[in-house]
Amino acid sequence: MNYMSVSFTHKNTDIIVREKLSFANDVKKREILKLICSNKAIKECLVLSTCNRVEVLAYIDDFNYTSDYVIKAISKLSGVDFDELKERADIYEDDGAIHHLFSVASSLDSLVVGETQIVGQLKDAYNFAKNERKSGVMLDLAINSALKCAAVIRSKTDISKNPISVASVAVCMAREKIGDLGGTTAVVVGAGEMAELACKHLITHKAKVIIINRNIDHAKKLAESLGENASIAEFSNLGEFINKYALIFSATGANKPIITDLLAKPQNFKRYFFDIAVPRDIDITCDDLSEVYAVDDLEEIVRKNLLLREEQAQIAYSIVGRETTKFYKDLKTLSSTPIIKALRNSAKKVAETELKKAIKRGYLRHSDIDEARKLIHQVFKAFLHTPTVNLKNLDENAQNDINAIAEIFGIEEDFDKFCENSLENKNEI
């Protein structure tokens, strides 16, 4: 049994392909999970889909052709050619998959290193897979350990100090383009997490925001949470507002562009459109008075951010390395601990049964029972010492040997019970 990760990110896949790979809604997520898990070699699986990445994390029986199967599943549902996806995909196995997962959770693999949005996105992907019964104890272990690793990095480094998300990078670029945002008004299209982040960063820089969303109630709720510097407008008036103001940020979950040349008419003032959605929201003709920036266009500011955080990132990567090693050490202990407990429990049961027989037959005086029980305990403890040491030193891939020991001693039931308890205790956050 092994961990495997198939990864498509801003590093290996451009935005045009990424938006085709997007599994943004529950129907698509459910469909890809069902298709991937129909392969019997794949025991557990989750899919993380954001504007900058699509990640498949799986716990599998066998590596042979499994990654190809996952890529074929993604190809089938996205319509992107298999060979193109295979060439682009980053595939990680065993400790490489865990190291990658920990790096993703800790925002070291993000477009903007140190942003904390990924933690919530990973939790959502995990909870969705769990609700769909596609995630079990092994992914529970991996995800919970990844979240703990991310927490350690946030507490021990400044990697997330003044956290920067893609939305805040867009606002930074807006400031570079027009200067002080104080007193300006920006149009924000959408009312989801990314739109909310854009609004918050704009308001932090003293701008006012007009929120436009198809669902007016969602827009109203967001505006109320932001205070007096936020207002709303009807989605039917979108064209009016994008032709009136210089700053437009769009972050909806639409399947196709909602701002096109039909809406965005030429104006006599400079406008800046920030498309922070995947798939893209904006498809207009650029000219001297209108500039459009998509997610991939934010990389220049991202590179500046990387330089500022490079030292902290190196510290964080060393923590990821240590936590990965610790994870596999704990996993090895988890493999051996249940069989050791089952053996000891079996020996204790046999000893207690024989002790009761001896008492019943009058072989022992009542005054000697406690001493006899202590003696028996010392005997089976001494007898099991060497097997215990050897079990703890078994290779981490020796699960078949452990299962055989349980079968030979007839302790499968106790072994399964202790396995379940061990995993449940380990998964407590």
UniProtKB/Swiss-Prot annotation:
This one is known as Glutamyl-tRNA reductase
Q: Which organism is it from?
A: Campylobacter hominis (strain ATCC BAA-381 / DSM 21671 / CCUG 45161 / LMG 19568 / NCTC 13146 / CH001A)
Q: Which SUPFAM superfamilies match?
A: Glutamyl tRNA-reductase catalytic, N-terminal domain, Glutamyl tRNA-reductase dimerization domain, NAD(P)-binding Rossmann-fold domains
Task: Tell me the domain comment.
Answer: Possesses an unusual extended V-shaped dimeric structure with each monomer consisting of three distinct domains arranged along a curved 'spinal' alpha-helix. The N-terminal catalytic domain specifically recognizes the glutamate moiety of the substrate. The second domain is the NADPH-binding domain, and the third C-terminal domain is responsible for dimerization.
Pfam families xrefs: GlutR_dimer (PF00745), GlutR_N (PF05201), Shikimate_DH (PF01488)
Lineage in the entry?
Answer: Bacteria, Pseudomonadati, Campylobacterota, Epsilonproteobacteria, Campylobacterales
Binding sites annotated in the UniProt record for NADP(+)? 190-195
Q: Which reaction does it catalyse?
A: (S)-4-amino-5-oxopentanoate + tRNA(Glu) + NADP(+) = L-glutamyl-tRNA(Glu) + NADPH + H(+)
Q: List the keywords (alphabetical).
A: NADP, Oxidoreductase, Porphyrin biosynthesis
One GO BP annotation is:
protoporphyrinogen IX biosynthetic process from glutamate
Per the UniProt entry, the Enzyme Commission number(s) are: 1.2.1.70
> Could you share any additional remarks the record makes about this protein?
During catalysis, the active site Cys acts as a nucleophile attacking the alpha-carbonyl group of tRNA-bound glutamate with the formation of a thioester intermediate between enzyme and glutamate, and the concomitant release of tRNA(Glu). The thioester intermediate is finally reduced by direct hydride transfer from NADPH, to form the product GSA.
Enzyme class, top EC level, equals oxidoreductase
Q: What does this protein do?
A: Catalyzes the NADPH-dependent reduction of glutamyl-tRNA(Glu) to glutamate 1-semialdehyde (GSA).
What pathway does the annotation place this protein in? Porphyrin-containing compound metabolism; protoporphyrin-IX biosynthesis; 5-aminolevulinate from L-glutamyl-tRNA(Glu): step 1/2
* Annotated site, Important for activity, chain positions: 100
